Amino acid sequence: MSYLLSKSRKDHPDKNGEVQKITPKTANWEYVGFEMYHLQEEQELTFDTENTETCFVLVAGKATIVTSQATFEHIGNRASPFERIPPYSVYVPHQQKVQIKAESYLELAVCRAPSQGSLPIRLIKPEDVGVEKRGYGNNKRLVHNILPETETADALLIVEVFTDEGNTSSFPSHKHDDKNSQTETYLEETYYHRFSPSQGFALQRVYTDDRSLDECMAVYDGDVVQVPKGYHPVATIAGYDNYY
């Protein structure tokens, strides 16, 4: 199995509901962290943002989120990401405690990046999320810009992408690994994959020009692909829609 592929633990979650956890240390990179939790109704978790800015994305389900500055009650608007409507998210700066109570079955993504900033805690509502259709032919996808580079954050960039069966995305192939480029934005990326129907899969390749990195992975529901550098296209299979 590729070292870039983190298999889902959704069938055997930790007692706190954790099914994925990517840190800079485990990924052997500098910045990005990603966690996924599957919480049962009434289950509660407390998070410490520590030295990171953190965005909590309600991938599916409803919750109340309590922070030091605000309480966001009864947020969440979709039972599945495949409803294809923008989600609710909450942005929290570093050195904050956050309490989350699930009000239904909850799929919660926790996205982190190092930060010493003090940007305000804020609710990102569905109407705040930019929606765009990209591509043509068999290269079409729907994008939800939850926290794009045009919005206020120190380092985080968060999007959802929906790719229909038999299409490619993150294509034409492109990369984000040159810190000194005038044309590239340096990014480390985590792709959290979901499929409809859930037994589906996709193929994702991560490779560099010189092929010193060249990994092609069969990715299943709940898996995470880590992209430290290089090109990273995704190809869906007929009959299975993809979300990441």
Regions found by a protein language model. Name each.
Residues 50-74, 165, 177-223, 235, ...:
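Glycine- and acidic-residue-biased ligand/ion/polar-headgroup-sensing regions
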Residues 83-97, 101-103, 113, 218-239:
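Conserved metal-binding segment of the jelly-roll/cupin
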Residues 14-46, 139-190:
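A short glycine-rich, His/Asp/Glu-containing loop-to-beta-strand
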Residues 26, 33-101:
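Extended, compositionally biased flexible segments
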Residues 34-38, 55, 89-91, 110, ...:
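Conserved hydrophobic/aromatic beta-strand scaffold that supports enzyme active sites
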Residues 1-9, 14-16, 21-24, 46-55:
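Sequence termini and other peripheral, non-core segments
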Residues 104-165:
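Surface-exposed beta-loop interaction hotspot
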